[in-house]
C-alpha cells in the first residue's frame, strides 16, 4: 500500500479535530481502559493506537459500545484476553488495526498464520466471555483477501467460537480506495458497524499494513 499514514502528522491532527467537531456531541468523552463499568455493555470496540486518527474512530463510536484503546506497550492479544476475562455474554467484538492478507498487524506485533499457534490458547479463552452466536468484526485492510485470508479468518472463527467478518479490500476512506464493507463472513453477520454515519463518511484514512520501519524511527 503506497499511502503512508504516518506522514504529515500535523495535517492529520487538524483533520481529526475537524471531523470530531462535526461528528461527535460536545459532551462525549472517551473512557479510559482502566475505568470500571457499573453497567455491562455487550459490544467492545478495540482500537490499536497505531491507527491514524484513532481518536476520531474512538469518539465516533455509537452509544452503548465500550471503547478500548490498546496500549502500545503491551501485547495486544494479551490485553484483549485479560479484558475479556472480566466480561460476560458479549454479543460483538470490533477489532480496528492494520491488516494485510491473513494478518492483523498491531503495534506490538501481528496475529497471522505463523503466530496463531502461539496465541491459540488465549484465543480459545475468548469464547468464555462471548454470548452464543457472538460475532467478531475485523477492520483491517485485506485480511480476508484470497484463499489464504479466508482460511485465516475461518481458523480464528474455530478458535474463538464466534462468527467472524473481515475485509477483502482496503478499509476506510473511499477516496483512498477504502470501504467499510466486511465482505467475507464465516456466517451471516447481524452486527452493525460501530461508528456513527458522519465518521464513516469523513474518516480521512485507511487501515493498510503497519509501516514498521517508520514506527521504529518514531
Predicted features by range, described:
Residues 40-42, 64, 88-91, 131-135:
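A general structural motif
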Residues 92-96, 103-175:
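Catalytic cores of nucleophile-dependent amide-cleaving enzymes
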Residues 49-51, 96-99:
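Short glycine-enriched loops at secondary-structure junctions
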Residues 166-211:
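Caspase-like cysteine protease fold
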Residues 1-13, 19:
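N-terminal acidic, proline/glycine-rich, low-complexity intrinsically disordered segments
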Residues 214-218:
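Short, solvent-exposed loop/edge segments of extracellular or virion-exposed proteins
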Residues 27-33, 77-91, 120-132:
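Short, basic/hydrophobic alpha-helical segments
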Amino acid at each position: 500500500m503506497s499511502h503512508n499514514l504516518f506522514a504529515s502528522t500535523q495535517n492529520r491532527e487538524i483533520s481529526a479535530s475537524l471531523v470530531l467537531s462535526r461528528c461527535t456531541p460536545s459532551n462525549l468523552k472517551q473512557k479510559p481502559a482502566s475505568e470500571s463499568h457499573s453497567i455491562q455493555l455487550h459490544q467492545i470496540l478495540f482500537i490499536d493506537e497505531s491507527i491514524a486518527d484513532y481518536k476520531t474512530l474512538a469518539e465516533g463510536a455509537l452509544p452503548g459500545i465500550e471503547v478500548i484503546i490498546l496500549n502500545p506497550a503491551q501485547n495486544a492479544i494479551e490485553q484483549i484476553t485479560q479484558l475479556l476475562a472480566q466480561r460476560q455474554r458479549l454479543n460483538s467484538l470490533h477489532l480496528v488495526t492494520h491488516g494485510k492478507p491473513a494478518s492483523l498487524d498491531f503495534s506490538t506485533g501481528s496475529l497471522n498464520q505463523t503466530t496463531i499457534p502461539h496465541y491459540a490458547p488465549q484465543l480459545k479463552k475468548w469464547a468464555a466471555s462471548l454470548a452464543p452466536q457472538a460475532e467478531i468484526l475485523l477492520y483491517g485492510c485485506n485480511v480476508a483477501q484470497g484463499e489464504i485470508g479466508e482460511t485465516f479468518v475461518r481458523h480464528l472463527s474455530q478458535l474463538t467460537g464466534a462468527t467472524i467478518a473481515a475485509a477483502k479490500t482496503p478499509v476506510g476512506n473511499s477516496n483512498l480506495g477504502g470501504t467499510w464493507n466486511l465482505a467475507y463472513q464465516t456466517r451471516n453477520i447481524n452486527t452493525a458497524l460501530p461508528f456513527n454515519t458522519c465518521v464513516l463518511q469523513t474518516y480521512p484514512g485507511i487501515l493498510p499494513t503497519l509501516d514498521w520501519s517508520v514506527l521504529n524511527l518514531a
